[in-house]
């Protein structure tokens, strides 16, 4: 590399390239002569000037600069200044996601301007280097994602520090001793930034705003996760006070204005630990032989007035948050668990969709009305499942219970009603999949927790027929409500409504999925109509059901899907194959449902269409908060996973490879489904190359292969609660154990032990 001097310091080509890129990026549209460039950058020596000219030639070749004349350049007009969201990673692989796009652009630490995860930034693309990787440079931080951060305090005599995860700051936060607020070393604390870093090596300055408690305490750790994502871990007293003043009494006027369903069989079906009962189902036989099924939803909007102090807090939260061991409700407890909750043997106000269904579950009629209900029974999913199976239902087959006869009457309290609901739900489900809905039945990780919050067991929970019974009627109600507003005559504009939309899958991601499943011997079509894509996905899900790779394939398939979100601009829902879909059925825990309730009432009374721009902004906020809540939930799962494995260091388990990266192998233990990483630096028998296209690592000398889905034996090496990370090491026969894999997935050789050094990759997922 050429060397030169600037201000008495030697400078190489890479350093001068960065300086020139920054120089031109700050002067878009200006034509700059060599003379101006040399003078502005203090390039005084002949070698340095010649090096600068060579670099500018290369930048022009890369289309970063446009050559105006033999001795002048300007920033290429196509190199526009863009805006996007910055993503910071602990392994230094930072990136920026341009507005309106999904693919991240790499940003090196030196070009990040100290941007934090989630910051909105202005950036430009850099000239491509020899590796041809697209790279960006942050020019300005437009908006900080947040100004408060959570971490562990380290208190010294004169200064204190907040130690944060590597994906937050490149440096720890310095806290003046007088601003520690009584915090001690190893306390978890919330710190507000009072002075942002303005240089590459400068740490931010902060002040403690809340001490959460000592690290390791369960409540402290869960509250730390909430605080990390800016989620509330306390309920404001003034909001609680306002909720306590709300009367749960049903007035004579309420009875007059509502349909009375108190004498119709009604029940709730929920998880065993649920307290907020959003929805209830009623059923009765009509004189014409059809069935009247009521989907009754807690009438939150009756009690929470738009613009009230409770409503403002609900808007801010937008959703309830579900951590492993607790729920952080969107509404105050008095509302969500008592007044609004559809508790058994209590009269409750509801917003209901009443369906008339024939025996094939075809909707013959419906109405959307305010009601008064009284639930006869609070069922747990397990109780309904037990009743169904006791009457001949085989879970997962899609077949209802056999018809009741005098010789074989249905067994169990309210058996006829529940079995009829199940039969109708199964017909609705079959029709939905026939129409092109995508079938994802992924198992969810659950923990059994003791009274101190410590996990004592870890297992996957699968959705059974009882869950699907409730799900189908909720889907039907949500779709019907959306159609009632959105489905209008051609040429007429529908009134504003928040829809739940799900765009078609990204074709490139579908192709990646196709290439992946081929390695397991499966075929998949990625071209054709939406319906053809859905049918191909469903066939794939059916083919891999019950196989060791099932969860893995479902995970990769889900990554090929777009994220569902809220919007007033309806594009339909790909996954459900619904042209119109909204969220109406969970107003206790989702704010969009409350918005829909209010708009339905307004439009039923002849009101004009609501402000589209205002509701789109609310939709965007709710979508963002939903994602944040999901991230917090995942972090709580990771924490409990590490805590659960903490006393199993050195133990060996059978596992499957669930992720392959350039810095290591992710593996999921078969027995308890906990996931950890085997760092690349610890696979010391060879130098491994990451084959991203084929989802595998291949050794250069011995050609051993580690591939997604492979069976391996691991040993628990480390459980880091602070980072929420498990480290594994290969154990026993450390090469993948291949069992009856197709030819496309070749067998590995046994791993040969050696001391050859390998890359030292920092970890992140």
Q: Which residues fall in each region the model found?
A:
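Intrinsically disordered, low-complexity linker and terminal regions at domain boundaries
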Residues: 119, 679-722, 726, 738-754
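Electropositive polyanion-binding surfaces
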Residues: 39, 190, 195-197, 214, ...
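Acidic, low-complexity intrinsically disordered tails
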Residues: 1-14, 687-696, 731-765
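Short, surface-exposed secondary-structure boundary micro-motifs
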Residues: 126, 194, 658, 717-719
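Internal insertion modules embedded within essential enzymes
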Residues: 151, 201, 717-731
């Amino acid at each position: 590399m050429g060397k030169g001097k600037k201000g008495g310091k030697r400078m190489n080509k890479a350093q001068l390239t960065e300086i020139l890129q920054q120089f031109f990026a700050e002067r878009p549209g200006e034509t700059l002569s060599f003379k101006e460039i040399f003078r502005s950058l203090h390039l005084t020596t002949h070698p340095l000037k010649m090096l600068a000219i060579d670099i500018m030639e290369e930048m022009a070749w890369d289309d970063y600069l446009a050559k105006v004349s033999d001795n002048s350049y300007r920033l290429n007009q196509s190199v526009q200044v863009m805006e996007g969201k910055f993503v910071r990673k602990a392994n230094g692989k930072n990136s920026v996601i341009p507005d309106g796009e999904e693919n991240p652009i790499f940003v090196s630490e030196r070009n990040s301007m100290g941007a934090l995860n989630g910051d909105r930034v202005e950036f430009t693309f850099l000239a491509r280097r020899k590796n041809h990787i697209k790279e960006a440079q942050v020019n300005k931080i437009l908006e900080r994602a947040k100004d408060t951060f959570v971490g562990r305090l380290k208190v010294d005599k004169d200064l204190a520090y907040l130690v944060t995860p590597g994906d937050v700051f490149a440096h720890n936060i310095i806290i003046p001793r007088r601003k520690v607020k009584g915090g001690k070393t190893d306390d978890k604390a919330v710190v507000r930034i009072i002075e942002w870093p303005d240089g590459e090596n400068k740490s931010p300055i902060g002040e403690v705003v809340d001490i959460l408690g000592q690290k390791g305490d369960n409540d402290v750790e869960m509250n730390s996760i909430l605080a990390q994502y800016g989620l509330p871990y306390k309920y404001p007293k003034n909001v609680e006070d306002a909720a306590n003043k709300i009367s749960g009494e049903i007035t004579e006027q309420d009875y007059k204005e509502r349909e009375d369903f108190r004498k119709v069989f009604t029940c709730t079906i929920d998880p065993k630990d649920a307290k907020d009962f959003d929805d209830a189902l009623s059923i009765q036989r009509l004189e014409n032989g059809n069935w009247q099924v009521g989907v009754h939803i807690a009438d939150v909007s009756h009690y929470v007035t738009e613009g009230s102090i409770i409503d403002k807090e609900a808007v801010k939260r937008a959703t309830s948050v579900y951590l492993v061991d607790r729920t952080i409700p969107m509404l105050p407890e008095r509302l969500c668990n008592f007044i609004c909750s559809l508790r058994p043997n209590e009269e409750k106000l509801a917003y209901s969709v009443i369906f008339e269904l024939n025996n094939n579950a075809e909707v013959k009629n419906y109405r959307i009305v305010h009601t008064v209900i009284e639930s006869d029974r609070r069922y747990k999913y397990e109780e309904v499942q037990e009743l169904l199976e006791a009457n001949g239902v085989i879970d997962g087959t899609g077949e209802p219970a056999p018809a009741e006869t005098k010789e074989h009457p249905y067994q169990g309290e309210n058996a006829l009603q529940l079995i009829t609901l199940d039969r109708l739900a199964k017909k609705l489900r079959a029709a939905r999949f026939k129409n092109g809905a995508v079938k994802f039945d992924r198992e969810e990780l659950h923990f059994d927790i003791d009274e101190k919050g410590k996990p004592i067991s870890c297992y996957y929970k699968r959705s059974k027929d009882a869950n699907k019974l409730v799900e189908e009627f909720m889907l039907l109600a949500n779709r019907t409500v959306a159609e009632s507003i959105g489905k209008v005559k051609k040429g007429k504009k529908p009134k504003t409504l928040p829809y739940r939309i799900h765009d078609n899958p990204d074709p490139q991601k579908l192709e990646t999925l196709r290439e992946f499943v081929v390695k397991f011997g499966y075929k998949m079509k990625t071209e054709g109509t939406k319906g053809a894509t859905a049918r191909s996905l469903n066939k794939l899900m059916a083919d891999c059901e019950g196989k060791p790779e099932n969860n893995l394939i479902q995970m990769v398939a889900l990554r090929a899907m777009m994220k569902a979100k809220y919007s007033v601009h309806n594009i339909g829902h790909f996954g459900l194959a619904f042209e119109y879909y909204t969220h109406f059925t969970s107003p206790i825990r989702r704010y969009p449902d409350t918005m829909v309730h209010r708009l339905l009432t307004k439009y039923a009374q002849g009101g004009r269409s609501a402000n589209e721009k205002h509701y789109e902004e609310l939709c965007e906020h709710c979508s963002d908060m939903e994602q944040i809540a999901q991230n917090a939930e995942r972090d709580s799962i990771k924490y409990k996973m590490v805590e659960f494995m903490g006393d199993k260091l050195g133990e060996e388990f059978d596992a499957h490879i669930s992720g392959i990266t350039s810095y290591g192998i992710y593996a999921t233990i078969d027995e308890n489904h906990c996931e950890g990483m085997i760092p690349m630096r610890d696979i010391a028998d060879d130098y491994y190359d990451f084959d991203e296209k084929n989802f595998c690592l291949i050794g250069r000398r011995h050609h051993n292969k580690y591939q997604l889905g492979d069976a391996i034996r691991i040993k628990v090496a480390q459980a880091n609660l602070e980072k929420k990370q498990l480290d594994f090491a290969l154990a026993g026969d450390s090469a993948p154990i291949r069992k009856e894999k197709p030819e496309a997935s070749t067998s590995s050789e046994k791993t040969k032990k050696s001391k050859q050094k390998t890359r030292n990759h920092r970890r992140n997922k």
